[in-house]
Every structure is written in structure tokens, then in C-alpha cells.
Amino acid sequence: MTTKKQPDSTIALNRKAGFDYFIEDQYEAGLVLEGWEVKSLRAGKINLSDSHVIIKYGEAFLLGAQIQPLPTASTHFIPDPVRTRKLLMNKKELNHLIGSVERQGYTIVPLSLYWKKNKIKIKIALAKGKKEHDKRDTIKDREWQRDRSRIMKKNT
């Protein structure tokens, strides 16, 4: 008996977050979406690179995420691709995020968007911003890892 291979549940990744920030803690949150947004996400029409999370009135909101509407969207409704979307989280997790952001100067950035049991979830991270020299160190390390693997491959 063969098992069915699960399709990749990842919708979008924010590769820029790992380069621009030191990732500390990761959390999973739900998203409040409209119908046209879910259809666009199924088609993979989202950009998370310039987005971030803010906390207002004890609730978390996703800002700057662009979900492009499909051309078949309704004509009597004007979709807003960059609207603010509410995140659904436990109160305990939310309180921890509020404390870290206000007291310790952390930023909350989205890492990925994915399907989980027919629901769309977003992985967010508590992060500290990198300075320019930290980014250069990251590039140097990445290039050294690439060169080292080439050398090892050539010698074997």
C-alpha cells in the first residue's frame, strides 16, 4: 500500500526576514481573510517581503502584506491588496509579544504563510534588526559555506 504524497502546504516565504533580522522566537497565528483573498492565496499571489506585525489595542495586525486580487474577482467590489489583516492568537502568546516589543525593543516579522487543515496560518517571529555589518557577515558566511561544499565535493 502506498501513501499519498502530501503537497507542499507552504504558500509564501519571507526570505528577507532571515537576512534583515536575528530571529528569536516563532509563533503560529491564524489570519482573518476575505473570500477573494483566500482564492488569491490558492493561486500564490502574495508578497510578504515588506510586511510586519503591529500590536494595537491588545490585538495583533499584519501590515504591508500584498495579496493581489485575481482578474476574475467581482466587479462590484473593489479589493484592497494592502489592507490591514487581524491575526488570531492566544492571549498568553499575545501578552508575551506585547511585553517583548514594548520593553525590549523587538520587532515582529512574518516568516511564512501556509495551509494547516484547510486553514491559512502565518508563522511570525520575534526578531531584532541587524546592522549593516551583521548583514555583511551573513553574506560572508553563506559564501564560505558554498565554497567549502565545492572544495569538499571536488576532493572526494
Swiss-Prot record:
Main subcellular localisation: cytoplasm
Segments of this protein annotated with the region Disordered: 135-156
GO terms under cellular component: cytosol
UniProt cross-references to SUPFAM superfamilies, sorted A to Z: Small protein B (SmpB)
Compositional bias (Basic and acidic residues): 135-150
Compartments (UniProt record): Cytoplasm
Biological function: Required for rescue of stalled ribosomes mediated by trans-translation. Binds to transfer-messenger RNA (tmRNA), required for stable association of tmRNA with ribosomes. tmRNA and SmpB together mimic tRNA shape, replacing the anticodon stem-loop with SmpB. tmRNA is encoded by the ssrA gene; the 2 termini fold to resemble tRNA(Ala) and it encodes a 'tag peptide', a short internal open reading frame. During trans-translation Ala-aminoacylated tmRNA acts like a tRNA, entering the A-site of stalled ribosomes, displacing the stalled mRNA.
Listed name of the protein: SsrA-binding protein
Species name: Legionella pneumophila (strain Lens)
